[in-house]
Amino acid sequence: MQVCVNFIQRRATELQPKVILINRLSAHLSTSPSPPLPHPLVTTSHTPVGALTPKPPNTSFGSHHQVSIAMPKFNINSPSFTPSVVDKAAIDSTGPAAPAAAPAFVPGKSPIDLEQIKNKLTISKDKKENAKSALPKLNPAVAGFTPGASASGSTTPKMATAPSFQPNQTSAINTNSNSSASATSQSGPPGASFQPNQSFQPGAASFQPRFQSGPSQIEPGYDNYYDEMSNGAVMAAAQNQQFPLQYHLYAPHYLSASRQRQLLSHQKTAKDFFLDPHLHQRLHKQSEDLLRVEGSSNLPRFVDKYHSLVLLDSNLNTKENGAPGESPQWVYKCMNGKDGKQYALRRIQGFVLTNEQAMTSVRKWQSIVHPAFVSLCEAFTTRDFGDASLCMIYDFLPSAETLFDLLNRGQQFSRDVIISYLLQLLSVLDTIHSAGLAAKTVDPTKILVCGPGRVRLNCCGLYDVINFDKDENVTLFQQQDLRNLGLLVLCLACNSVEATKNVEQSLTRLDSELQEIVQYLLSSNTSKTASRVLASLTPLLTATFNESLNTNDSLEHELRRELENGRLVRLMAKLNFITERPGPDPEMSQQWSETGDRYLIKLFRDYVFHQQDEMGKPVMDLGHVVRTLNKLDAGIDERITLISRNGQNCLIVSFKDLKQCIESALRDLE
């Protein structure tokens, strides 16, 4: 009950000023001969919001000021509160209100007669029209509030000069006489600038913003394909944009022929995680040969622009080919001081150049390019070895061996391998003979095996420089190249370099097809050429070509497996960028890596690399490191428990949250 009494007294106190105001107005109107003022309770039209008349200074009732203001009353039925316009002349004729005439307000006694007050405040039609004309009217054709419209700082818009408002259009206001020229110069192709004044259409499929002509702000040289789009085509292109795959996404092998057996998606073998062991071993051996250096030797430090010489010959006291009357030859690995690449330097010991024109033949051989050909780079004479020597520079093929060495070790060659070697050598001979040259080096000591099923013809151009002064017939040497190729096939088929001593007996060990090929190559028919022999071996070419394609697919598969092998390195680099480093803020530099998300990253670092077993010994499990970092890179929802080193803090967090913490910390550092 006491609460109700307090509430009634409080409400009476709040209403007392309003009742006093109404009583004073009633007393004022009863003594004034002028018509009553307009009141919002009885007016039939409402002044628009925002069109307010400046309010005169407030004066307290009972003062002797000549102007009295009629306070409007709040009407809940009106859409907005609008102050009424007071006729100053009507108030001046009556003078200020007499506060003594107002009856005293007694709460709870006499009720207020609202109908009587409403009748007294009834406005005449003429006075209402005058009051309405004194207010500014809202014109729909006039733009709204325009800041800075006048130089004086007034925020009132200039109604007379304001441009008319037109929906979905943009009006250009000319500030000077040159504005038209400026507007013309800014016109451009559609789609250059965005026009936000597009009306919303309910039920439309999608919102497509309009584009307005304007200059394209693009850096010079940038290929902006948006220039060809218009009317929302840019938004359509953005919706169809495809983003690149994440680094942790691996695509499975798409060739079913390469699978040894059918496995389920979750079943893996050891070969699925590692490089092919044979390819791995071969590549490592090549790297060792490239990086091998000579500890101590009597070789010169520099030979022309080449340095770091390493002897590659296995037999130092014998000539390489064993032919009588020829100068000894030595082969070195060297490095070019200009381009930093490895080359093979073939030295002809004791050679004296008698004709400078002999070096011109090197240019012809430099133009020969073939996958079964060891390119000749340059030739020069030198005395850096202590004598007159001819140096021939060829491409260096690491881990390459000659057929002569392989045959001496008892290497067996299958029929398919022999046919593959035959086709490769016929192809390179066809290229050489078409250039008007002869190889003169189709010999087991000059043919290199540089990979599975790959051979290369080496030392080409060597005898053109040595025997330059001799009158030689190129056609005869081309026929000799084909005959030597037949003898080479015979040696490979018999697995011995001694097979050429008794050709007739060695041919009996070959099958009919190979026997026919060798007999044709060894024949004295001068019309035979490398291209004709290749044409006759077209049926054999299919199998070799298919094998080369399968090898290419296998190498591409191995390359794809190693495509993103640097993901974990990048991830570990990010972790070390964040942990135990000062922060970007000088005030929080010491605590930056120990607070917030960075503390989780530090605990995760200990979880990956600093684990211990139950005996307190360090655990160095590479599988745990790789598995955990892969999960972090993928950002999966799996949760792990992170425990501080003192064991007082224990946090459960997912790999997804940890990945977000790392990205957030890196953004702070940037």
Curated annotation (Swiss-Prot):
One of its GO terms (cellular component) is P-body. The N-terminal zinc finger binds to poly(A) RNA. Contains a pseudokinase domain. The protein kinase domain is predicted to be catalytically inactive because some of the residues important for catalytic activity are substituted and it lacks the equivalent of the binding site for a peptide substrate. However, it has retained an ATP-binding site and ATP-binding is required for mRNA degradation, stimulating the activity of the PAN2 nuclease in vitro. One of its GO terms (biological process) is mRNA processing. It comes from Yarrowia lipolytica (strain CLIB 122 / E 150). This is PAN2-PAN3 deadenylation complex subunit PAN3. It is found in: Cytoplasm. One of its GO terms (molecular function) is ATP binding. Residues 539-577 form a coiled coil. Residues 292-538 are annotated as: Pseudokinase domain. The gene is PAN3. Residues 578-670 are annotated as: Knob domain. Homodimer. Forms a heterotrimer with a catalytic subunit PAN2 to form the poly(A)-nuclease (PAN) deadenylation complex. Interacts (via PAM-2 motif) with poly(A)-binding protein PAB1 (via PABC domain), conferring substrate specificity of the enzyme complex. Keywords: ATP-binding, Coiled coil, Cytoplasm, mRNA processing, Nucleotide-binding. Residues 168-193 have a biased composition (Low complexity). Regulatory subunit of the poly(A)-nuclease (PAN) deadenylation complex, one of two cytoplasmic mRNA deadenylases involved in mRNA turnover. PAN specifically shortens poly(A) tails of RNA and the activity is stimulated by poly(A)-binding protein PAB1. PAN deadenylation is followed by rapid degradation of the shortened mRNA tails by the CCR4-NOT complex. Deadenylated mRNAs are then degraded by two alternative mechanisms, namely exosome-mediated 3'-5' exonucleolytic degradation, or deadenylation-dependent mRNA decaping and subsequent 5'-3' exonucleolytic degradation by XRN1. ATP binds at residues 346, 445-446. Belongs to the protein kinase superfamily. PAN3 family. It holds the Pfam family Pan3_PK. Residues 149-167 have a biased composition (Polar residues).
